[in-house]
Amino acid sequence: NKLIFKSKKFSKYNINKYKLYENDNIILGDDGGNLFIFSINEKRIIRKYNFYKNKFKKIKKKINFLVANNIIFVSDNLGYLYAINYKKDKVIWAKNYKIPFRSNLKLYQNKLIATNQNNDLFFFNKTNGDLIKKIPTEETLVKNEFINNLSISKNNLFFLNTYGSLYSININVM
């Protein structure tokens, strides 16, 4: 085992446990809301992006992100949902839905799928962030640290919520 490369520290904040890979780039996020695009070929950070204004600077961000075709889709615990073209360093769209998102993100055809802390399941238009459909499920009375989980298999979307219920939805009818 030979060390090929070691970078300097990316951030003063904790790095998100999820790392994504696309086109020889590693995409990381941190608790400060920063997104880092690290080029494996160039062995350096080629982009650093922070969507948040100074008024959110002291708030710890829990960001969930997904990448497809040079677009990073992001949801957070502040209620924001946004899409960034990381190659062009440009925000495509951004929306504030005013309730914290609390799940991984999924893409299916032209839909971006997420859930919030109230166990509501959302389908958004991935090109503009507009809400297509909202499906409420049971709400938990006690807030916990469980993160809702989304998974897609064939034509089914599986949704495990914080209440502990598992839903299976035919995604083609959404």
Residue ranges of model-derived segments:
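Short loop/turn segments that connect beta-strands within beta-propeller blades
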Residues: 1-2, 39-43, 85-89, 125-129, ...
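Extracytoplasmic beta-rich repeat domains
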Residues: 2-23, 44-69, 90-109, 131-154
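Structural signature of WD-repeat beta-propellers
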Residues: 30-31, 69, 76-77, 116-117, ...
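Blade-level signature of beta-propeller repeat domains, shared across WD40, Kelch, NHL, RCC1
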Residues: 153, 157-158, 163-173
